Each structure stands twice: as structure tokens, then as C-alpha cells.
């Protein structure tokens, strides 16, 4: 599966690209200021359905270039995997509010509770993850299922019908001990929904 990776001008982006390439995926990187129509044309030219990957980034979804337009055009057409800002942008695209978290974290290892879901197979009931965020998604609609959380903050959301999966934490962080396995299972899970 080819991955179209949206870089939200974040220092973690190429750590994620490296992890995905180590897993054997072909990754094409585009920044969030790319013309959304051009990106959709590129994705539609692929012989097999590609995956759209949304990186972490500074700020909020509204200040992230063409990110929300890209999501609006890709949603329901391509599987989408979002990390941190990626979760917030996907949640906002479904009507959730993005608010300031009661705790600002930058490089904090946190044990989060995992719900029983295929994407977490073999990873246990909780997982230590690396968190870097000051914002969170709130007021999620019913069509976004929260499959992991910490202190009432959604840490993982999914919409299987629309092939959407997102994490508030950073799988590529050294603090996320099973991060590579989770990335592999995440891409595999979305690929299996095609």
C-alpha cells in the first residue's frame, strides 16, 4: 500500500516516515499547503487504493494550511490515519470541537486504557505512549468511536465505515514502547477495510 503523507510542518514527521519505510511502505511526502485537488488527482492515479496519513503539527486544524480541505476531499474515498493534530483535524471534520486540554504535555509518557479492538490485538489492555499536545477533541459525534482514552481525553478514535483511524499520542515516540507494532497494525487494519 502506498502512503500519501501530509507533513504539517512538524519535527516528528520524518520520524514517522522513517518508521513507515522500515515497515516496507512506499511513502510520498507532501506538505499541508499542497493544492487539495492536485493531491486527490495523484491519489486517484494509483492502481491500488492508497492511504492518506496526517502527521502531527503545531497549532490547530484551522491554522494548518489546506489540511481540512484535504480531509474533506479524501474522507470516504481513501483510508486515513491521523496522528495528534491529525486526530484533531479528523475529529473536527466530523463536528467535534477542539479545545485546550486541562493538562499541557510535551514529552510525557502516559499509560492509556485500550478498549478491545482489532487494531490493538496483542498489545494488552493498556499501553504506555508518548504525548505531546495542549489541545484535545471534545464532543465527538457517535460515528467516531473512542477506542483508547486517558483522563477523558480521546487517545484513539475510529470510524470503520469511513476507514478513519487516529491517535492523539505519538506512535513514533521512543516513549511509545510498542509504537512500530501499532503503526504496522494500524495500516494493516485500514488496508483490511478496503
From Swiss-Prot:
PROSITE patterns: GATASE_TYPE_1. It holds the Pfam family GATase. Residues 2-194 form the Glutamine amidotransferase type-1 domain. L-glutamine binds at residues 57-59, 88, 134-135. Its EC number is 4.1.3.27. It catalyses: chorismate + L-glutamine = anthranilate + pyruvate + L-glutamate + H(+). Pathway: Amino-acid biosynthesis; L-tryptophan biosynthesis; L-tryptophan from chorismate: step 1/5. One of its GO terms (biological process) is L-tryptophan biosynthetic process. The active site is at residues 84, 170, 172. Gene3D superfamilies: 3.40.50.880. Keywords: Amino-acid biosynthesis, Aromatic amino acid biosynthesis, Glutamine amidotransferase, Lyase, Tryptophan biosynthesis. Heterotetramer consisting of two non-identical subunits: a beta subunit (TrpG) and a large alpha subunit (TrpE). Part of a heterotetrameric complex that catalyzes the two-step biosynthesis of anthranilate, an intermediate in the biosynthesis of L-tryptophan. In the first step, the glutamine-binding beta subunit (TrpG) of anthranilate synthase (AS) provides the glutamine amidotransferase activity which generates ammonia as a substrate that, along with chorismate, is used in the second step, catalyzed by the large alpha subunit of AS (TrpE) to produce anthranilate. In the absence of TrpG, TrpE can synthesize anthranilate directly from chorismate and high concentrations of ammonia. This is Anthranilate synthase component 2. It comes from Helicobacter pylori (strain ATCC 700392 / 26695) (Campylobacter pylori). The lineage of its organism: Bacteria, Pseudomonadati, Campylobacterota, Epsilonproteobacteria, Campylobacterales.
